[in-house]
Every structure is written in C-alpha cells, then in structure tokens.
Amino acid sequence: MIILPIAKILQGIILAADHEVIVQGWVRTRRDSKAGISFLSIYDGSCLDSLQVIINHDLPNYKSDVLHLTTGCSVVITGSIVTSIGVGQHFEIQAKNIKVLGWVKNPETYPITAKKHSLEFLREVAHLRPRTNIIGAVTRVRHTLAQAIHRFMHIEGFFWVSTPLITTFNCEGAGEMFRVSTLDLENLPYTSKGKINYEKDFFGKEAFLTVSGQLNGESYACALSKIYTFGPTFRAENSNTSRHLAEFWMVEPEVAFANLTDIAILAEKMLKYIFNAILIERVDDINFFAEQINKNIIKRLEQFISSNFAQIDYTEAIDILQNCKQKFDHTVFWGMDLFAEHERYLADKHFQAPVVVTNYPKDIKAFYMRINDDGKTVAAMDVLAPGIGEIIGGSQREERLAKLDQRLADRGLNIEDYWWYRDLRSYGTVPHSGFGLGLERLMIYITGMHNIRDVIPFPRNPRQASF
C-alpha cells in the first residue's frame, strides 16, 4: 500500500482496482445523498484541485464519523483509484476505510469556510490562509519561482553564497534600517557625550538587519567570478502601502569581469527563463490566477518572453517623457528619479515591451555605482516591465578605490565603516557588476495579485508582526 499525493492521482497514475492506496488531506466539502453515499472533496496542497472521495454507508464509522465531517477536518483515507463518471475530474477514490485525525472543534467559528473570503480578511488569519485555493496557488508558484531561479543560476555557472542578515554597515546609504541590539532598553548605557554607548552592546558597535547582501556578495564574486545571494532583506520604511514590505526576499547576482551591458543581458535571460518555467510547470495555478485575478497574465508573460528588450539612456527617457502627450502627477526633469507612472508609460505605451534604462544621475543612485566618464552619471540600470514598472535594479560597481572613497565622502558616509569593502579594490581589483531582483515584486507580476502582502507567507509591515 502506498501513499499518493492528490496531484499524482489526478495526473493519471492508475493502479489496479484491487490495489489500495492511501490519501491524506483536509476536507473541503461534504455532500450526502439519500442513497446513503457521501461525497468528500479533500485537498492536500500538492495541486490546485481537490479530489472526490466516495464513501458508502456500510463503512463502520460512517454514522459516527463521516456524517460529522466539516470543512477543515483532517483525514486519512484508504481506497482504490477509480475512473470518475462525473464532470470535472477523471479520477476519484472509492473509500474502504477512513480515519479522522483532527476535528474542527467549532465549525461555526472556523474562519476558512468553503465560501470565498476577501484577501483583507485572510491577512487577519494568516496562519490559516494557506488552506485557501488562492494562497495555496501563490505558495506553489513562489516555490517554483525560487526553484527556477536556483536552477538558472546553476546552469549559468553561478555559486550561491549565503550572506549575513546582521550587519554593521549600510549598503544603500539610507537611514531606514532595523537596529539589532541586546542592550537593556530600560537601562541604556551612555557615553560622556550623552550618546548610547554601543561598545557595551553584543557586537561592540551599532548593528542592523541587512538591506542587501550585495556588498558581501561582491567579496565572493571577486574570488569565484559568478555568485548570487538569495535571502531576506529588511527596510524600516514606515510605509503602509500595497507595494511595501519591511521584510522581503532578494536575488542578487554578482559577476566579476562584467560591465553594465553584460549584466543587462543576464537579467533579460534570467527573467525569460523563469517566466517560461512558471508557464510550463504551474499550468493549473497560472490558469487559476488568469480566471480569478487578471485575465491578461498569461498573455503578458508570453509577450515578455518573446519580446526584444528596448534599451535607452536615462537622458533619452527624460526626453521621451517630457515630449509625450501624457499628463503625469510628477513633473519630469533631468535629475529626478523616475516614478512608477513614468516607468509604466515607457514600458506600456511608448515601447510596449520591457525596457532597460541606463546611466542615471549619480546624485540619485547609491555610492557603489561606477561613475561614468561624464562625471554626472553612473553605470546603473533598471529593467522596466509592462504592467508594473521596475522589477530589476543593477549597476556596474565602482572598482577604483579613489573614486569609491570620493563617493563615500560625497554621501557623508564614514569610509572606515567600509574598510573591508574598500580593501577589495587594493588587491587585484576588477570590473564587476550585479543587480537585485525582489522576489515578491516578481510574484505580483506573475500572479496578477494586487497587494504585496498576499504573495509572502507572513508579511511584515508597520505595526504588523503578529504571526
């Protein structure tokens, strides 16, 4: 006797009628007929669809157990796979034995009933929302997306590097970082100047949750040539919107001996590979999102895969935006950072294709980006996708120590805090480039979901860390 996931049964793994199998899962619905037969719809999360189980009244525990099953009860069923005569699926289980592992104590108050719930409500019961079709589908797509990224990187010769989550420096040069401390908040030590004495803290200095694994990744790229980081990052940005999370996952490839053009080509190749993997490996889930969330997502992904990326300079992008007939909420001028409305116009309307925008003004970009020969711009790029805007941001890194020191000084950053990062430029420095890809932002693009909190298992945002 073997245990089969529902996905395998529905794919058509047929066994002889007298060969019993075991199916484990949770009850979605129960329907009873006057003929003394009950029909259970059960799911186990292995696929979108539920499996129908036919239970005859002659089972010993039919009256004591089966007729009391409600949504959410967990069961183990032994039976035979048979061809279904009903509409909707090809196979079902003829039960020979059913064991109830867990009852729903109060079906009247069980939050995840068979009816459809709003996504807002489901966020309030985040520990139970994986039991719904929509969050189950999100989770399977997210898994396949992560696997496709790892697979692509492996094929391309990249090594995965696990970078630290606790750091003592600021990669982006911004102030929105979570502090990590073991100091007694009710009895803080102070210096003679009245400042918190972090020498008494666990690490002997200020420590934070990382905003990026990039700087650490550069260290390994300058030894292994091609690496990537893949893990959680944190931003203490007090922004309570559908586009922001305090904790999110980033993929950050870093390539030695590569310039901006090289990394733009890599970004295009990676995106097309993983989108194609999703369309092939998660057919049912993607069709579900197309039916329930956004009917255009399959066409959008297919067009993305078949498109030739447009590539323009930032200055050219500003010219296009200033001369178009579109009215924007934010005035367009050289030196500004592009807003979502500008990115969407370029990708959706002007080019009607993915766009790579390069060479941004240095004053709006991070200190580690390589200064161009004009002294005003840096070798940075953003990949803009139709329907969403920016999905990748990257750059060629500044490999010249003197230039890097000047950039740190211009940003008011203490160069001693970055001593080891600067040290990389003193021993066999090489041109190198990389980019960052937010996993949750990519999930929104793939699934059509509207709120970023619905594509991560337990979202963290201002005043929300309950689960």
Swiss-Prot record:
GO terms for molecular function: asparagine-tRNA ligase activity; ATP binding; nucleic acid binding. The keyword Aminoacyl-tRNA synthetase applies. Homodimer. The gene is asnS. GO terms for biological process: asparaginyl-tRNA aminoacylation. Pfam families: tRNA-synt_2, tRNA_anti-codon. This is Asparagine--tRNA ligase. Belongs to the class-II aminoacyl-tRNA synthetase family. Keywords: Aminoacyl-tRNA synthetase, ATP-binding, Cytoplasm, Ligase, Nucleotide-binding, Protein biosynthesis. Its EC number is 6.1.1.22. GO terms for cellular component: cytoplasm. It comes from the Bacteria. It is found in: Cytoplasm. It comes from Baumannia cicadellinicola subsp. Homalodisca coagulata.
